[in-house]
UniProtKB/Swiss-Prot annotation:
Pfam families per UniProt: CRPA
Protein name: Sulfur-rich protein
InterPro entries assigned to the protein according to its UniProt record, in alphabetical order: CRPA (IPR008436)
Species in which this protein is naturally found: Chlamydia caviae (strain ATCC VR-813 / DSM 19441 / 03DC25 / GPIC)
Transmembrane segment boundaries: 62-82, 91-111
Primary location: membrane
Localization of this protein: Membrane
Keywords: Membrane, Transmembrane, Transmembrane helix
Keyword S-adenosyl-L-methionine: no
Its membrane topology: Multi-pass membrane protein
Gene Ontology CC terms: outer membrane
Length: 160
């Protein structure tokens, strides 16, 4: 069937892509995207779970908080206690600490109120530091996904 309309998807994508890269560096756009994703997660995942009977019980709520704190403390303690014996691989014990910290942060900070630029900067720095430690066991700015330069660029852009 001839409609007279050409399929020019590649042309449209080529026109949008250069501007999209610049837009994605804007911290306001990043925060808006984070809030959209968190809103979807809250509406489709968190709220249905929160309304279940088991999650509403006080025992379950206390257990989740205690579990997050235990993971955080145990991961940090094992990292420092066993660093001499494990050497470079001691950073693997940070994984439970990071999971516990992320669990506590997401339940207390991000799921109840919208994300602000300050919270987003804090989250990006936490992720950058975590990636830097997990890639080679040292804090040496060797991360590639969550770089501190990208968060510094957005900090200077919002301050000027």
């Amino acid at each position: 069937m001839l409609t007279g309309v050409e399929n020019s998807e590649s042309g449209v994508i080529d026109l949008i892509k250069p501007g999209l890269d610049d837009v994605m560096k804007n911290e306001t756009v990043q925060v808006t995207l984070v809030n959209s994703v968190l809103g979807w997660c809250k509406a489709h995942i968190v709220d249905p779970i929160k309304t279940s009977k088991i999650v509403q019980s006080r025992a379950f709520q206390i257990t989740m908080v205690v579990l997050g704190v235990i993971l955080l403390i145990a991961g940090l303690a094992l990292t420092f206690v066993l660093q001499g014996q494990l050497g470079k691989n001691a950073f693997l014990f940070l994984i439970p600490a990071v999971i516990g910290l992320v669990k506590l942060l997401t339940t207390s900070v991000f799921m109840e109120k919208p994300c602000t630029p300050e919270k987003w900067r804090l989250c990006k720095r936490l992720l950058a530091t975590t990636e830097d430690i997990l890639d080679d066991g040292q804090i040496n700015q060797s991360n590639t996904i969550f770089t501190t330069e990208s968060s510094d660029v957005t900090n200077t852009a919002t301050q000027s």
